[in-house]
Regions:
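Immunoglobulin-like IPT/TIG beta-sandwich domains and homologous Ig-like subdomains
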Residues: 1-36, 77-79
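Short, acidic Ser/Thr/Gly-rich low-complexity loop/linker segments typical of extracellular
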Residues: 3-7, 70, 75-93
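N-terminal active-site segment of His-dependent metallophosphoesterases
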Residues: 49-57, 64-65, 109-201
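Short, ordered, surface-exposed loop/turn motifs in non-cytosolic proteins
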Residues: 55-59, 63-78, 96
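Extended active-site neighborhood of metal-dependent phosphoesterases/phosphodiesterases
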Residues: 105-127, 131, 200-304
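Active-site neighborhood of phospho(di)ester-bond hydrolases with catalytic His/Asp-centered motifs
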Residues: 151-153, 187-193, 221-229, 314-318, ...
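Active-site environment of divalent metal-dependent phosphoester hydrolases
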Residues: 157-160, 196-199, 227-236, 272-275, ...
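His/acidic metal-ligating clusters that form di-metal
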Residues: 176-187, 218, 263-265, 277-338
């Protein structure tokens, strides 16, 4: 597809009207050279017009079938709003974090909940703050009252020493078989370090390659993600630049969702420093362990909106909140309290 326009952050192409709802590998082609950019999925959505509102630069509709879904929380990570009776939402956003997402409401799942890892509950922002952009979210009714959440972490995939083969024949094969045999919906939460920043560039295996690999290997268990320290860009300094690739590839670095009566919260407790990092130069990959004030502010509003205060709450972070330096490894009769 020819490029119809570019900005400092984006490139635009015209999508053919007859394009199918499917995954596509995107390459930039110049003469005889080509560079893989990402794997994207084309979704078909409603063409319902959402009216503009003064001062609002993100808008859209959350819908199920031919009806809007009211009361759904929508956020850019800093500002959070709730859909109105028509399922419409508007956000006055600084577009600082580069994404918008919904909190999946109880009794629904995103229609685009698939193995391409987009998950259907978030969208990347594409325009400058002065431009209003529209992002719709389609839901389907789903019974997740009983479900299974599998948890994985610290994959450190780098396409070296047969790690991809071992991951495929181990975790992927076993959890896929478990999900196929399950009588209730099965989900997975990867709690960080899906990749290994040290080898992002040496081995050419970064977060887009991880997502592409997972999709191409037919893993059908829907995967939510949390960000780990090794999922930051080792060539850049600072938390916001360091997490940019993650947020563009796997979505918001903090968010929440509901499955059945369980309220899940995913937070990012990595404050990326990466002393000495620059273009082509690996930094020291150092970081602070902290949950930012912006996240805590968002979290307070998120938890306040949970109607049933007795509902189970699951909070996921990559770095442990508590450490016991006096701990020892030994077989015990039961697991001690964390």
């Amino acid at each position: 597809l020819p490029v119809s326009g570019v900005t400092a952050k984006t490139a635009r192409v015209v999508i053919p009207a007859a394009i199918a709802r499917e995954s596509y590998d995107v390459y930039v082609v110049r003469g005889a050279q080509e560079q893989y950019v990402a794997t994207v999925k084309i979704y078909l959505t409603t063409d319902q017009e959402v009216p503009d509102k003064e001062g609002m630069n993100i808008k859209g509709i959350v819908f199920c079938g031919d009806k809007g879904v009211p009361g759904v929380r929508v956020s850019d990570g800093l500002q959070t709003v709730t859909t109105d009776e028509n399922g419409y939402y508007w956000i006055p956003s600084l577009k600082t974090l580069g994404y918008v997402f919904i909190t999946i409401p109880q009794g629904y799942l995103p229609a685009a909940l698939d193995n391409n890892m987009m998950m259907g509950f978030w969208a990347g922002l594409t325009d400058e703050a002065g431009v209003c952009e529209k992002h719709n979210f389609e839901l389907v009714e789903a019974d997740t009252e009983n479900h299974v959440m599998l948890v994985g972490a610290d994959l450190h995939l780098a396409d070296k020493q047969n790690d991809l083969r071992n991951f495929k024949n181990g975790f992927i094969a076993e959890t896929q078989a478990f999900a196929d045999a399950s009588s209730v919906p099965v989900f997975c939460l990867m709690a960080g370090d899906m990749t290994w920043d040290r080898y992002w560039y040496d081995r050419n295996f970064r977060l887009p390659h991880y997502r592409q690999w997972l999709s191409r290997n037919g893993y059908s268990v829907p995967v939510f993600h949390a960000m780990g320290n090794h999922d930051n860009d080792p060539y850049v300094q600072g938390d916001a630049p360091g997490q940019l690739s993650y947020c563009r590839t796997l979505g918001p670095n903090y968010y929440s969702f509901n499955l059945g009566k369980v309220h899940y919260v995913v937070l990012d407790d990595i404050d990326w420093i990466n002393t000495g990092g620059s273009d082509g130069v690996l930094g020291s990959r150092d970081y602070n362990r902290v949950v930012s004030l912006a996240q805590m502010t968002w979290l307070a509003e998120d938890l306040a909106a949970v109607e049933d205060k007795t509902a189970p709450l699951v909070v996921c972070l990559h770095v442990q909140l508590y450490e016991n330096y006096n701990a020892s490894f030994a077989n015990t009769a039961k697991m001690p309290s964390a």
